[in-house]
């Protein structure tokens, strides 16, 4: 009986300790579970689980593989806009390029934060769109003081990728109205390898293109209206997504007025000063004319130095050509004045030579017929036509008068002839003083009105 009681005591003790051990294990498990709930997973462990080697994430495969295409929304923030070069027809811009897409493989719920800002080195661990700039001529990243890149992952799997770039983009320009032209420069964003079956670029709905506050250009006025378009590209390898933004640039005239138009205008006006200089001051007028022509030629060459060698005529070319024409015409005007003012000397020399020939001819005739006075009287020969005047008389010693025997008018004296031609030369100068400025004024009216209308039409076409 005592043995039975002792056995029951041992059995009850065993069950007691077994129950105590079980309760201890349960308590320990709950404690560990509570600790695990109160202490979240470390960021390193979380990232390893999300996109590490053990996560099964493959950056070589796009999201929704063999499914619908990935929609990537783009946004551009312009830090600086400038270095617009007409010779190379390109422009330089510094931007923040932001791309946003959804990758379901990166969605998470284990981590408490709504988003994670990751180091740029993690970019190699995830899939990224193969975006490139179709009209890019040169580009570079920024690495001071670190890589200027941003990677942010959201709970729902959205990915934000931002990068700072400096781009040199081509911008074909029509310079027919230069420097009163309006240009349109584009920026095209295109997928390099993924067709539209895999990837589609779209502009962000709100503020797709932003410009830094206070951004100004030295020679252009950047219009606030940004023209956003889709430019799908069709190649032999397929149809590729493409989006573009068009920047409308209106050239400012201030620089060209000061550097080109006003100096050339003053040179033309300076050439008119020769009209008020005495025609006898040949060195002064010739020196002034040649100087203005050479200066205008240099000015015209300088205006073309900063422009490409295009095959069409520009507005500045027309202006410079007309100014050069006016300056050269002023020099030719003095040549005409000088020629007219010296014509009396040539005329006197010609008359003297002609008179000598006429007198010699008359004397020859006279001696030929002087042997027979009767024949001379019967013929009633008159030497009036040969310049002899009343030296010889006809029959009865009377000079016949009639319609065929008009009395010769005595030529003017050399001084009178000189005065006539000098007055004519002075009249040319007087007419030039009025005609040259008037013609140049008419040209200016037509020039500025026509190109003002063309400029307005270009602006209107851009708005359409």
From Swiss-Prot:
Glycans are attached at residue 71. Disulfide bonds join 171-185, 231-242. GO terms for biological process: chloride transmembrane transport; glutamate receptor clustering; presynaptic modulation of chemical synaptic transmission; protein homooligomerization. Phosphorylated by PKA; this causes down-regulation of channel activity. Dephosphorylated in response to activation of HTR1A signaling; this increases channel activity. GO terms for molecular function: extracellularly glycine-gated chloride channel activity; glycine binding; glycine-gated chloride ion channel activity; metal ion binding; transmembrane signaling receptor activity. Zn(2+) binds at residues 225, 227, 248. The chain crosses the membrane at residues 256-277, 283-303, 315-335, 431-451. The keyword Amino-acid biosynthesis does not apply. This is Glycine receptor subunit alpha-3. Residues 1-33 form the signal peptide. It comes from Mus musculus. Strychnine binds at residues 235-240. Residues 34-255, 304-314, 452-464 are extracellular.
């Amino acid at each position: 009986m005592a043995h039975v009681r002792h056995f029951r005591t041992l059995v009850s003790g065993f069950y007691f300790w077994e129950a105590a051990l079980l309760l201890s294990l349960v308590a320990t498990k709950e404690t560990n579970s509570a600790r695990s709930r109160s202490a979240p997973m470390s960021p390193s462990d979380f990232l390893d689980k999300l996109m590490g080697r053990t996560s099964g994430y493959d950056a070589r495969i796009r999201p929704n593989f063999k499914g619908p295409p990935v929609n990537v929304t783009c946004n551009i923030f312009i830090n600086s806009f400038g270095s617009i070069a007409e010779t190379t027809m390109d422009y330089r811009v510094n931007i923040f390029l932001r791309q946003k897409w959804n990758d379901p493989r990166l969605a998470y719920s284990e981590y408490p934060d709504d988003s994670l800002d990751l180091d740029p080195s993690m970019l190699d661990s995830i899939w990224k769109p193969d975006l490139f700039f179709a009209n890019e001529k040169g580009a570079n990243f920024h690495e001071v003081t670190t890589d200027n890149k941003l990677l942010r992952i959201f709970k729902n799997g959205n990915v934000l990728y931002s990068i700072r770039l400096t781009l040199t983009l081509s911008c074909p320009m029509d310079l027919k109205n230069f420097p009163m032209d309006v240009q349109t420069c584009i920026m095209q964003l295109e997928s390099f390898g993924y067709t539209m079956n895999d990837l589609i670029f779209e502009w962000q709905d709100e503020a797709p293109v932003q410009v830094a506050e206070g951004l100004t250009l030295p020679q252009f006025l950047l219009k606030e209206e940004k023209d956003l378009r889709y430019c799908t590209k069709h190649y032999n390898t397929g149809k590729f997504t493409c989006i573009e933004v068009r920047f409308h640039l209106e050239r400012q005239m201030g620089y060209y007025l000061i550097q080109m138009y006003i100096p050339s205008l003053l040179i033309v006006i300076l050439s008119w000063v020769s009209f008020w200089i005495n025609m006898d001051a040949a060195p002064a007028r010739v020196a002034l004319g040649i100087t203005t022509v050479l200066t205008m030629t240099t000015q015209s060459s300088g205006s073309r130095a900063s422009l490409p060698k295009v095959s069409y005529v520009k507005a500045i070319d027309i202006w410079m050509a007309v100014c050069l024409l006016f300056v050269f015409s002023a020099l030719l005007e003095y040549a005409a004045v000088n020629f007219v003012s010296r014509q009396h000397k040539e005329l006197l020399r010609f008359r003297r030579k002609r008179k000598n020939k006429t007198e010699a001819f008359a004397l020859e005739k006279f001696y030929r017929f002087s042997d027979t006075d009767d024949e001379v009287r019967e013929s009633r020969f008159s030497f009036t036509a040969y310049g002899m005047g009343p030296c010889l008389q006809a029959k009865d010693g009377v000079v016949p008068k009639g319609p065929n025997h008009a009395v010769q008018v005595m030529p003017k004296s050399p001084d009178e002839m000189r005065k006539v031609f000098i007055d004519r030369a002075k009249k040319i100068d007087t007419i030039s003083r009025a005609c040259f400025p008037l013609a140049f004024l008419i040209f200016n009216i037509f020039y500025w009105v026509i190109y003002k209308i063309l400029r307005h039409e270009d602006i209107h076409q851009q708005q359409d």
